[in-house]
From Swiss-Prot:
PANTHER family per UniProt: SOSS COMPLEX SUBUNIT C
Name by which UniProt lists this protein: SOSS complex subunit C
Annotated organism of origin: Xenopus laevis (African clawed frog)
Quaternary state and interactors: Belongs to the multiprotein complex Integrator. Component of the SOSS complex, composed of soss-b (soss-b1/nabp2 or soss-b2/nabp1), soss-a/ints3 and soss-c/inip.
This protein's UniProt keywords: DNA damage, DNA repair, Nucleus
Gene name of the encoded protein: inip
Chief place of localization: nucleus
Length: 110
């Protein structure tokens, strides 16, 4: 930086992250185009459809093993909650990833 420059050192370093971001975005765009080209070539190649059918079986197996793992985690969490709490809990799928949910009784209005 020359003495006649009015830019502060902070302003010079502030531009660096934006250049870095541009480089990262360019690299991501390049990868995206590469993947799109690979996807197009695999759909044009009839032999590729056979290879694409296999991962679904692996996915089903993985989903099943994940469900078993979650069921084991739910059972352990439920046992722990019942042992250490006076409340009542149930296992239920939760949009927030909770393995167990507390049951809260409804009281009639007096």
């Amino acid at each position: 930086m020359d003495p006649g420059s009015t830019a502060s050192p902070l302003q010079c370093t502030a531009g660096f992250p934006s250049k870095n971001r541009v480089a990262i975005l360019a690299e991501l765009d390049k990868e995206k185009r590469k993947l799109l080209l690979q996807n197009q070539s695999s759909t044009n190649n009839p032999g590729a459809s056979i290879a694409l059918a296999r991962p679904n079986m692996n996915k089903d197996f993985r989903d099943h093993s994940e469900q078993q793992h979650i069921a084991a985690q739910q059972k352990a969490a439920l046992q722990h909650a019942h042992a250490h709490s006076s409340g009542y809990f149930i296992t239920q799928d939760s949009a927030f990833g909770n393995l167990i949910l507390p049951v809260i009784p409804r009281l009639e209005a007096e």
